[in-house]
């Protein structure tokens, strides 16, 4: 039974909201991070390139489910959203209000396995990667749950320095880093991310950049700073201080999983002994996966 306007207002006020939703009757949820509103609109626009019709969809870091509900609206046959901090507002209010079949689970992405979750045609992975302490393991967990020819839409804070675009880069800021946020710890650049996912049989299909913003160190002082300033007078085309590494923006990518796309389908060692990709995957799992760590019998 649909709630009245007064009941909706009262219900919305019981929860804290990350996403903004129009519930009708002039009632909306009030986001705690309204500065992200334009970025969410940007993400939704980019997702027009994804065909959700009849697809099984996983939304990682779903929060209140903005993209989960949108995937369902665009024709997905099944949508599962996972988050470390399950949105009770989404479960108790939004899903019933929208008469939605979206499922939401409190779950860490490192717990993802095909055995427990199955595989998905589309995986949405927005605003999470740059928070991961173990990005390679997290990406592997996700790709293992992606169907062959499946699509992953990945959005993250990225290093977009034009001076390093030809270098496979992963920046892990520490101490007095200009990234200036304690949970923001993993910043790939586009080439670094594409190369990493290529090793996991994923091909980059499309890329978009949202409002590049330059983040720089505070102006340096002392003899070394004065020497650099002198160098810039002599070589005026040098990049501005701090921009060489620390250009940051949000980017969204579409990757497609294709078996055999990895350039390292076989691994050559100095002994010229060759091992299959299946052996390499088994080695990775036995080394890093706590559930299979006991199985050390790896055969070429």
Language model regions located:
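Conserved N-terminal segment of class I S-adenosyl-L-methionine
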Residues: 1-118, 222, 230, 247-255, ...
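Short conserved AdoMet
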Residues: 52, 133, 147
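A short SAM/SAH-binding and catalytic strip from SAM-dependent methyltransferases
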Residues: 122-135
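A short glycine-rich, Lys/Arg-flanked "PGG" loop and its adjoining helix->strand segment in the class I
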Residues: 136-151
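Conserved class I S-adenosyl-L-methionine
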Residues: 154-176
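Short aromatic-enriched loop/helix-cap "lid" or pocket-rim segments at secondary-structure transitions
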Residues: 163-169, 216-222, 266-267
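Acceptor-substrate binding/catalytic loop of class I
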Residues: 176-191
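Conserved S-adenosyl-L-methionine
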Residues: 202-213
């Amino acid at each position: 039974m649909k709630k009245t306007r007064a009941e909706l207002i009262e219900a919305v006020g019981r929860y804290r909201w990350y996403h903004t939703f129009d519930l009708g009757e002039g009632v909306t949820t009030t986001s705690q991070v309204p500065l992200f509103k334009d970025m969410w609109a940007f993400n939704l626009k980019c997702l027009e390139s994804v065909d959700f019709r009849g697809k099984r969809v996983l939304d990682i870091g779903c929060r209140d489910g903005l993209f989960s509900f949108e995937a369902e609206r665009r024709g997905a046959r099944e949508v599962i959203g996972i988050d470390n901090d399950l949105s009770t507002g989404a479960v108790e209010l939004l899903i019933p209000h929208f008469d939605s079949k979206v499922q939401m689970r409190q779950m860490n992405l490192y717990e993802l396995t095909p055995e427990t979750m199955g595989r998905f045609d589309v995986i949405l992975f927005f605003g999470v990667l740059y928070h991961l302490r173990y990005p390679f393991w997290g990406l592997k967990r996700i790709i293992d749950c992606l169907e062959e020819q499946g699509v992953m839409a990945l959005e993250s804070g990225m290093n977009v320095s034009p001076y390093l675009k030809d270098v496979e880069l992963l920046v892990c800021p520490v101490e007095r880093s200009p990234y200036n946020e304690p949970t923001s710890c993993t910043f790939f650049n586009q080439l670094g991310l594409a190369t990493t996912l290529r090793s996991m049989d994923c091909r980059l299909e499309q890329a978009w950049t949202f409002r590049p913003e330059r983040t720089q160190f505070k102006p340096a002082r002392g003899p070394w700073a004065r020497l650099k300033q002198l160098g810039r007078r002599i070589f005026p085309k040098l990049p501005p201080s701090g921009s060489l590494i620390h250009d940051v923006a949000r980017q969204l990518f579409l990757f497609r999983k294709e078996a055999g796309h990895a350039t390292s389908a076989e691994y050559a060692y100095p002994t010229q002994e060759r091992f299959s990709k299946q052996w390499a995957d088994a080695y990775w799992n036995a080394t890093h996966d706590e559930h299979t760590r006991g199985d050390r019998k790896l055969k070429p």
